[in-house]
Structure formats: C-alpha cells, structure tokens
Amino acid sequence: MSCCGGSCGCGSGCKCGSGCGGCGMYPDLEKSTTFTIIQGVAPMNNFEELGEKAAEGGNGCKCGSNCTCDPCNC
C-alpha cells in the first residue's frame, strides 16, 4: 500500500494522519496480538484470531493521491 510518500496514514474519520502505519485506521493496533489460554476440564480455546480481526479496523481504507483516503469507507 502507498503511504503518500511515507508521510500519510489514514486517521480517524478517514482523514490524513501524520505517520506511515500501513494506511490503516489504527496503525498502533495492526501488529498487536492477544493470547488467552485457559486450561482446565474444558477444552482449551485460543482467541488469537478474534484479536487479529478486531485489530484490522481499516475496512478497505487506504491512502490515495494527494494524501486522501481511497476508497473512504472506513
């Protein structure tokens, strides 16, 4: 994805941000991973996938020309 020359990221409200975080809505959450492990008599559940889906956030919002979001459907 383009980040408008490294100076743009789509921020809240699909407006231009100051950093190049992959042009996601919440660049600080894109690389976070959450693990929950509960062991006992019940089967072990791993909620890693749920955390990744919640962290995506961008929903197709990416930086276009002139530091604007294209498409703007955040």
UniProtKB/Swiss-Prot annotation:
Keyword Metal-binding in record: yes
Keyword Amino-acid biosynthesis in record: no
Disulfide bonds: none
Signal peptide (from-to): none
InterPro entries given in the database record: Metalthion_15p (IPR000347)
PANTHER family: METALLOTHIONEIN-LIKE PROTEIN, METALLOTHIONEIN-LIKE PROTEIN 2A
Family of the protein in this entry: Belongs to the metallothionein superfamily. Type 15 family.
Its job: Metallothioneins have a high content of cysteine residues that bind various heavy metals.
Protein name, as recorded: Metallothionein-like protein type 2
Lineage: Eukaryota, Viridiplantae, Streptophyta, Embryophyta, Tracheophyta
